[in-house]
Amino acid sequence: TGDFMQIIGIVTEYNPFHNGHLYQIKKIKEMYPDSVIIVAMSGNYTMRGEISVLDKWNKTNIAINNGIDIVLEIPFIYSNQSSDIFSYAALKMLNEFKIEKLVFGSETNNIDLLSLASSVQIDNKKFDSLVKDYMSKGYNYPSSIGKSIYELTGIKIKESNDILGVSYIKEILKNKYNIKPISIKRTNNFKTNTKKSNIISAYEIREFLNKNESIKEYVPNNV
């Protein structure tokens, strides 16, 4: 791809596509003006097993109309699983398309911290046994992972985008993919319950849709 054109990957659900997603795409184009942006996206069902607000064809059209070049569908058997399995499939696909950088939103926006929280999980018997200990005490799997990371590194990974970011970086490290992770500061949390900004989370937009409230100020005009 030479020095000029960069192939950038994004992992997403676009459920639905909103101003925060558009902000991310604009930031990528600012940082890498001649980039090709490839998205790995869940289809008609999301990671939580819910039916997507829009079907995959509409989501794809909206993505293309807002600056994405290629949309890949994460197969259903991976896309409605845990963040680790979701990330495994997404990164495998994006690596096959030779992306050089993976860009994702992050609450902490600290790649070094997220990388440390990722690397401590790889081929680490101490980590594995800590996770088992926490699960035997009644914690669920994600909480056990978070507590084990904290015990070994002092890093607290609590926010949804950071959790996904750690999953992505872990896949990159584990598989020795030649992909550089790049974080963009998240302007809002997963559930902020505020209408002060025109960028709110997909979760909040789905809540507004459930209440038949208008979402037009939170999504691009072509959504």
Q: Which residues does each predicted region cover?
A:
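Active-site cores that bind ATP or allylic diphosphates and position pyrophosphate for catalysis
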Residues: E73-V223
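N-terminal catalytic cores of NTP/NDP-binding nucleotidyl/phosphoryl-transfer enzymes
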Residues: D3-K59
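Short acidic/polar active-site loop segments enriched in Thr and Asp
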Residues: S35, D69, E100
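Generic alpha-helix structural propensity
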Residues: L54-N58, N66, Q81, I85, ...
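A glycine-rich helix N-cap at a beta->alpha junction
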Residues: N61-P75
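Non-catalytic positions within long, well-ordered alpha-helices that form the structural scaffold/packing
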Residues: K29-E30, I64, L91-N95
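Short beta-strands and strand-loop turn motifs
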Residues: G9-V11, A40-M41, L72-I74, I182-I184
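Short, contiguous strand/loop micro-motifs
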Residues: T12, T46-M47, A63, I77-Y78, ...
